[in-house]
């Protein structure tokens, strides 16, 4: 939550909108509200951009039907709208790293972006420092501001106030950290998502993420979107 205020999670995909709200007590979380609606005739992620009014209307309906009272929202954006890299850098102090970030020289030297830096929202985090080898690993996540705005405009027009934005795979990772039985060991954890628009694997090991797209043929995509397939295949 943000400053102890309630926050509702909003997940918008081409074919479905989901809302979820948790309640916490003594470090334990309970799913208190869950609501969703399917979007008819949504083909791919471009539907969200080209038919935004439909998504606004559906989201407004879900808020009402799900009896969501808070207006604060945590919004997920798709992996396909983000550039995610773990970059290896010479060891720097926090002050040196912040100075390099503030001058944009760090990203210009280590990350090749297709557009100007000011067209991206950038998040970074030091994953680990290796003083013996004088190296450090840094997580770099960049999302186009235009892509983010498409989602935030839908959320705002439906009456919510987006206070948190996160890439979907990392939102899932953060939720997974609440599962102490899974995160207490050093064994790698894999998160796999298959769908019409998002297909990737995220492997977590020692707090370092590795993410890779999974290629699906057009035939496989049609199979995933076919509501009449054998339930065993779901």
Q: Where are the language model's segments positioned?
A:
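Hydrophobic/aromatic-enriched cytosolic interaction surfaces used to assemble or bind macromolecules
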Residues: 1-234
């Amino acid at each position: 939550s943000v400053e102890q205020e309630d926050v509702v999670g909003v997940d918008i995909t081409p074919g479905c909108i989901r809302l979820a709200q948790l309640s916490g007590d003594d470090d334990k979380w309970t799913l208190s509200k869950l609501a969703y609606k399917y979007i008819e005739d949504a083909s791919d992620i471009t539907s969200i951009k080209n038919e935004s009014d439909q998504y606004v209307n559906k989201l407004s309906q879900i808020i009402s039907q799900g009896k969501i009272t808070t207006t604060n929202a945590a919004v997920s954006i798709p992996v396909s709208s983000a550039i995610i890299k773990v970059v290896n850098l010479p060891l720097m102090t926090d002050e040196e790293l912040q100075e390099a970030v503030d001058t944009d020289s760090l990203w210009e030297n280590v990350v090749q972006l297709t557009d100007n830096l000011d067209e991206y929202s950038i998040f970074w985090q030091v994953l680990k420092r290796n003083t013996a080898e004088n190296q450090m690993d840094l997580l770099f996540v960049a999302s186009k501001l235009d892509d983010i705005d498409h989602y935030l405009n839908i959320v705002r027009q439906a009456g919510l106030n987006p206070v948190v934005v996160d890439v979907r795979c990392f939102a899932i990772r953060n939720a997974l950290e609440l599962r102490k039985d899974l995160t207490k060991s050093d064994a790698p954890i894999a998160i796999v998502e298959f769908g019409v628009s998002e297909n990737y694997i995220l492997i977590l090991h020692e707090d370092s993420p590795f993410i890779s797209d999974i290629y699906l043929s057009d035939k496989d995509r049609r199979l995933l979107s076919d509501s009449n397939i054998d339930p065993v295949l779901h």
